[in-house]
């Protein structure tokens, strides 16, 4: 599971994969794994016909660099992928956590006082303090509810200058990705924590995102990714049923694991390849390939 692929290392986003890292990851996958379209892997899971060392590549949220940087590399190695898109952030939108990170990138040195939100005062100096501040705010805000998160993000942004409006895909680029063979999946409208919403609002998020993507692409997405994606903390059985009711054929989560015979197709586990060296990555992938019935979704 990926989110972004950056052209070079960004100190404000230390965990994101760079183009160089992504290239060797895709090279290793292409040489040693049977990399499948996720929709095909789901069909094969349903019929117990997955090949050995099967793997799938997925991206969450719908960042512009998925098309600009990741897709050409995947095309080079013949790697299929699925990009799960939160439809409300297309065409110049920005996720609340990105608003915080990009604001902390440019806020002047001094202190950021978030006492009125119960978050305290943060020193702002070198890049290290900015990264610590950004991710402390994100962690503390994630489960406060959508309105409160937006309020905090907007307040932080008010202390910064102009923020980028090109982080996410446009509708046109989304169509280009689809035309290039990349599958597009549903990821709600606004990327909320579903477990924190009234059930009808959760239904609207799931169905609305699917309808919006269908309007852009001419066909509805077949697979869904739960925002944040952790069982019980971010979604529960009610949301699984909503995903089924919306017409999705399967769904992925962020609980770490590999999928095999008997895995719930509406709760397919994934993992993120954080490894920064080829050797560690190969060891991790080899270990995952031996688990269960030797199938993995990244």
Predicted features, each with a name:
Residues 25, 70, 170-173, 239:
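Residues within well-ordered alpha-helices
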Residues 78-91, 125-139, 232-238, 261-276, ...:
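Short secondary-structure transition/capping segments
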Residues 1-58, 65, 96-105, 109-114, ...:
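C-terminal active-site subregion of NodB/CE4 polysaccharide deacetylases
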Residues 90, 190-192:
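Short, catalytically relevant binding-site loops at active-site mouths
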Residues 91-183:
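Extended, charge-rich helix/loop segments that form flexible
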Residues 57-105:
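Gly/lys/ser-thr-rich phosphate-binding loops in alpha/beta enzymes
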Residues 50-51, 63, 68-84, 138-162, ...:
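CE4/NodB-like, metal-dependent polysaccharide N-deacetylase domain
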């Amino acid at each position: 599971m990926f989110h972004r692929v950056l052209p070079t290392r960004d100190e404000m986003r230390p965990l994101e994969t760079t183009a160089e890292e992504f290239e060797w990851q895709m090279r290793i996958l292409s040489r040693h794994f049977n990399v499948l379209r996720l929709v095909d892997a789901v069909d094969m899971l349903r019929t117990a016909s997955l090949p050995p060392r099967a793997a799938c590549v997925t991206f969450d949220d719908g960042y512009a660099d998925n098309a600009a940087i990741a897709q050409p590399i995947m095309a080079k190695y013949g790697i299929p992928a699925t990009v799960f898109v939160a439809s409300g952030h297309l065409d110049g939108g920005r996720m609340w956590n990105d608003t915080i990170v990009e604001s902390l990138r440019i806020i002047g040195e001094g202190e950021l006082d978030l006492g009125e939100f119960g978050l305290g005062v943060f020193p702002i100096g070198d890049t290290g303090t900015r990264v610590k501040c950004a991710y402390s705010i994100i962690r503390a805000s994630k489960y406060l509810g959508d309105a409160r998160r937006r309020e905090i993000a907007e307040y932080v942004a008010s202390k910064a200058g102009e923020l980028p409006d090109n982080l996410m895909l446009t509708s046109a680029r989304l169509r280009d990705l689809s035309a290039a063979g990349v599958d597009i999946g549903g990821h709600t409208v606004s990327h909320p924590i579903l477990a924190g919403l009234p059930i009808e609002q959760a239904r609207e998020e799931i169905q609305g995102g699917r309808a919006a993507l269908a309007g852009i692409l001419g066909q509805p997405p077949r697979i869904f990714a739960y925002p944040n994606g952790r069982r019980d903390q971010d979604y529960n059985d009610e949301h699984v049923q909503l995903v089924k009711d919306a017409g999705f054929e399967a769904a992925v989560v962020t609980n770490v694991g590999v999928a095999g015979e008997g895995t719930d197709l509406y709760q397919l586990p994934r993992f993120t390849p954080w490894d920064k060296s080829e050797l560690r990555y190969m060891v991790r992938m080899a270990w995952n390939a031996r688990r269960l019935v030797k199938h993995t979704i990244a």
